């Protein structure tokens, strides 16, 4: 956060509320909260949110956006906050939101789901929580062209949900390969098959072309409700022992993905750490 602010940039803080990555496949309660439930768990969420933001503010580091949960399509803090237990989930979200509003009243709050082209899922999720009057500002969505379909489908969903729920929208995660080389990394995601699916060549020029098209798509959302894009993960270089999870971490989370650097060929830097053209030219997009 300090380096970001020193570089003249704003930042979004993303609370996962877990000891590990949180996404639709895993939303595991922190070990320290394992025995907590109900109001006790809600209080823990609130206090953790407040304490984290206080610590940042003590260093004059104030996020302009705060994401309460990461890819919470199926809920958060399982099993208490499963999406099927909508009331519990909503109360946990409200606890985090309350902490943000108290400590960073000017920060805009983001609720983030995955699969940004799935309009049915977005409608179902936000309709399901509508009766709880969650106090948030922005709907964030993950969009990976090799998994989630076309930019036109993304735009259709953004137009619909921004209007239906009167919220701004942004792409909270995206990436695409600048090569299909694996660099000897275990578990690398992007492949020649993905290159064919996206229609963009797996080159620096293809990566830049995709981002230009994505930026243009978000800018074209009706009523200027599309406000931005976050790239994930721009700086995972193929260096020795770089991994998204240790073996012990994977075992703890019961995650079956191969440990290693899964995103190296989708970074915004090449294998030698030089900025790709997409990053160099981003301000012109």
Locate predicted features.
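A structural motif corresponding to the C-terminal end of an alpha-helix
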Residues: 3-11, 51-63, 95-109, 132-135, ...
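Active-site beta-loop-alpha junctions enriched in small/polar residues
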Residues: 16-20, 68-73, 112-117, 141-146, ...
